[in-house]
Design a protein with these regions (language model features):
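Short, conserved charged micro-motifs
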Residues: 46-49, 189, 279-285
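Short, small-residue alpha-helix embedded
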Residues: 106-120, 265, 270-274
Length: 317
């Protein structure tokens, strides 16, 4: 593989919201305005060295061990599999809070791979990189699923037909805004997944499957009313809500303020809400944040289109 004539590359990868209420490990969308940045500076040897990790809350807890930090672990695996000898100094800027349910591990994995890819004269396609990003996410979650990594890399709203190997379906986007509210809590993905170990009744699975099918239909037919009726999480939310202080109160506040849907983003504690109008988005965001305040929780909010942009190169030189 011939190398490009550059010494450094910096890439950005967006935050994501996984599950979308009805698609556990299957659905996810990219979020505008927040994400992780990884800069790679080429070394004269083949070592990977993490020089700096900075940024959002929890960044100081991330590991400098290159086998256990997802950003370097995915680069190391890719280079080993392709038998490519390269070394980098690595600088990680976290825009996504640790344990927030906004795809932080996926974003670091994706940003690292996209930055690495810039060093090749003929870059690999994102399809060549995505399995490595999902691998990176699995190091944190303990499960090989791509509902964060795939929308993070490609953007938009995606349905995962398969995570291993990755097979995705790009879904139509409805004309709605997404409100993202992240309270000052942290939830480990592995612990959140442990709450789902007990079997579900078949009737619950059937009802949830109907919600998923109706949601997909609503997206293709652009039926906002059907989408609002269908985005009901009867599978995951009843077991995970207890991890998010004031969850049902915040959810009710979102609906009362005009949201057409509201649920948990990924493993939480971040919550998402869908709104029809831009003006409603600000009202819903404020209502959700005000309700979290009643539980003595500070929070951050973002407003995004569902057609969020995927990962991209910020600079190379």
């Amino acid at each position: 593989m011939k190398l490009a004539n550059i010494k450094s590359a910096k890439a950005f990868a967006p935050a994501t919201s996984a599950n979308f209420a009805v698609g556990y490990d299957l659905l996810g969308f990219a979020i505008n305005g927040v994400g992780d940045t990884v800069e790679l500076i080429k070394r004269d040897d083949t070592e990977l060295v993490i020089k700096q990790i900075s940024g959002a809350a929890g960044a100081d807890k991330l590991l400098f061990d290159t086998d256990r930090n997802v950003a370097t672990a995915v680069i190391k695996k890719f280079l080993a599999d392709k038998n490519i000898r390269l070394g980098f100094d690595v600088y990680i800027q976290k825009g996504i809070t640790l344990g927030s349910g906004m795809g932080g591990s996926a974003a670091s994995s994706v940003a690292a791979l996209v930055a690495m890819n810039a060093f090749f004269e003929t870059p690999y396609s994102y399809n060549d990189l995505i399995d490595y990003a999902i691998y990176g996410e699995s190091l944190i979650s303990g499960s090989f699923h791509g509902d964060n990594a795939v929308p993070c890399m490609f953007g938009g709203l995606v349905l995962l037909q398969s995570s291993k190997p990755c097979k995705k379906i790009d879904l139509p986007i409805v004309d709605c805004n997404v409100v993202i509210v992240c309270p000052n809590l942290s939830i480990e993905t592995k612990k959140a997944r442990e709450l789902l170990k007990e079997p579900y009744d078949l009737s619950t699975i059937v009802e949830h499957s109907a919600c998923l099918a109706a949601t997909i239909s609503a997206l293709y037919t652009q039926d906002i009313e059907l989408l609002s009726e269908s985005l009901k999480d009867i599978l995951i939310e009843p077991r995970r809500f207890k991890l998010i202080i004031g969850f049902y109160d915040v959810q009710k506040a979102a609906y009362d303020a005009g949201a057409i849907a509201c649920g948990i983003s990924g493993s939480g504690p971040t919550m998402f809400a869908l709104v029809k109008k831009q003006d409603d988005a600000n009202v819903v965001a404020k209502a959700m944040q005000d309700k979290f305040k009643e539980f003595n929780l500070k929070s951050n909010s973002w407003i995004s289109a569902m057609s969020g942009k995927g990962a991209y190169i910020l600079e190379k030189k």
